[in-house]
Amino acid sequence: MELLKLNRSVQGPGPGSGSSLCRPGVSLLNSSSAGNLSCDPPRIRGTGTRELEMAIRITLYAVIFLMSVGGNVLIIVVLGLSRRLRTVTNAFLLSLAVSDLLLAVACMPFTLLPNLMGTFIFGTVICKAISYLMGVSVSVSTLNLVAIALERYSAICRPLQARVWQTRSHAARVILATWLLSGLLMVPYPVYTMVQPVGPRVLQCMHRWPSARVQQTWSVLLLLLLFFIPGVVIAVAYGLISRELYLGLHFDGENDSETQSRARNQGGLPGGAAPGPVHQNGGCRPVTSVAGEDSDGCCVQLPRSRLEMTTLTTPTPGPVPGPRPNQAKLLAKKRVVRMLLVIVLLFFLCWLPVYSVNTWRAFDGPGAQRALSGAPISFIHLLSYVSACVNPLVYCFMHRRFRQACLDTCARCCPRPPRARPQPLPDEDPPTPSIASLSRLSYTTISTLGPG
């Protein structure tokens, strides 16, 4: 098969193993940190098959590229302009959008064009830049997802400690640290990336590792640092968050039932107050709470003076109170956590095949090449780019405030012209004033004239 033939021609002499950046069959992170640019000579396959494959590939690349650029630019604009969305969590989502936009703009065109031209024409500088920027983008996205998970865990499960440091300035420092750490981690990519000839007038952007052992060590290191360890941290954090939210909703449900029963029988605390849990350092103990005082799923203890006033106050009969504001805030937090979980799952689903293929190729290159050449590796390649365009779709479908902010931003950028009031036709009678307008007119006339 042509992929295996080309892979053999790329290896070259010497102790180092070469990983091509110009091939759909080459690992994304071991090659360009993601980009294999197909440099197949047109004579390798039949003309009809190659043209059909290229048409499908161009269409998919174009759709993913437009969705990635348009969606992430929209996220950056909306989060930047909307004051209501300037929260700590959204600051990390903004950084995530920037990294996805970097992945789309800096890597996708330089992956597709060599596919069409059959050779890499952009030179060594662009070759090294593609490799480095894609690695940085993937690393930043992973670290941002870890930071979001830890921030949500602190806000929901450790609210008292989180209030000390959970600020936008602290989030900005964490985001800066993720970008710097990712930049340092991906330094080996530009060092071992180069453009080499693999045939007559055919160039490839590829990696030349010093030895096979170095390539294997690098693959395992990335698998641990950017996949397994972040995956475990995120899973544990969201597991604890889900447990805390479930306990908060469960306690609120019990308190609401007790409050309604007390209001029907002998009356109870006004405003839906009921014995509830207060979370301290992850634990819960029953105290009296007031609805809506805390938005992190943790009830706040009622001061003694208010308890005394509550005891002396006789409740007035009225309708059974509805859902408490505190429960509504817990439900809102649950929706946000659900959205973040979807983002994390989609990211790891898109990149799991890439990491698996990279590790497989590092330890068994010929076997991986035989099994994945052709359509499978092309699908894996495109799947990694899909991760850059799914987040805007998730926000639009699962984030009500983001949808409203998008509408507000569009209305601000494209204001509608004022509507002119329809004029009555010549043969139409003038509109008859309503009873309410007549009453206002009479009242205005009497008030203006004053007493007679």
Swiss-Prot record:
Which residues are sugar-modified?
A: 7, 30, 36
The annotated regions of Polar residues compositional bias extend over 434-452
How is this protein situated with respect to the membrane? Multi-pass membrane protein
Q: What is this protein called?
A: Gastrin/cholecystokinin type B receptor
Q: Which gene encodes it?
A: Cckbr
Q: Where in the cell is it found?
A: Cell membrane
Lipid attachment site numbers (S-palmitoyl cysteine)? 413
The tissues where this chain's protein is expressed are given as: Parietal cells, pancreas, brain and various neoplastic tissues.
A GO CC term attached to the entry: membrane
Query: Could you tell me which Pfam families the record lists for this protein?
Result: 7tm_1 (PF00001)
- Organism equals Rattus norvegicus (Rat)
Q: Where is this region: Disordered?
A: 1-21, 257-286, 421-452
Spans traversing the lipid bilayer? 58-79, 88-109, 132-150, 171-189, 220-242, 339-360, 379-399
SUPFAM superfamilies the record matches: Family A G protein-coupled receptor-like
The family note in this entry says:
Belongs to the G-protein coupled receptor 1 family.
Entry's Gene Ontology molecular function annotations = cholecystokinin receptor activity; gastrin receptor activity; neuropeptide receptor activity; peptide hormone binding; type B gastrin/cholecystokinin receptor binding
Q: What is its main location?
A: membrane
Q: Which InterPro entries does the UniProt record give?
A: Cholcskin_rcpt (IPR009126), Gastrin_rcpt (IPR000314), GPCR_Rhodpsn (IPR000276), GPCR_Rhodpsn_7TM (IPR017452)
Keyword vocabulary terms for this entry: Cell membrane, Disulfide bond, G-protein coupled receptor, Glycoprotein, Lipoprotein, Membrane, Palmitate, Receptor, Transducer, Transmembrane, Transmembrane helix
Q: What does this protein do?
A: Receptor for gastrin and cholecystokinin. The CCK-B receptors occur throughout the central nervous system where they modulate anxiety, analgesia, arousal, and neuroleptic activity. This receptor mediates its action by association with G proteins that activate a phosphatidylinositol-calcium second messenger system.
Here the disulfide bonds are: 127-205
> In Gene Ontology terms, what is a biological process of this protein?
positive regulation of cell population proliferation
Q: Which residues lie on this side of the membrane: Extracellular?
A: 1-57, 110-131, 190-219, 361-378
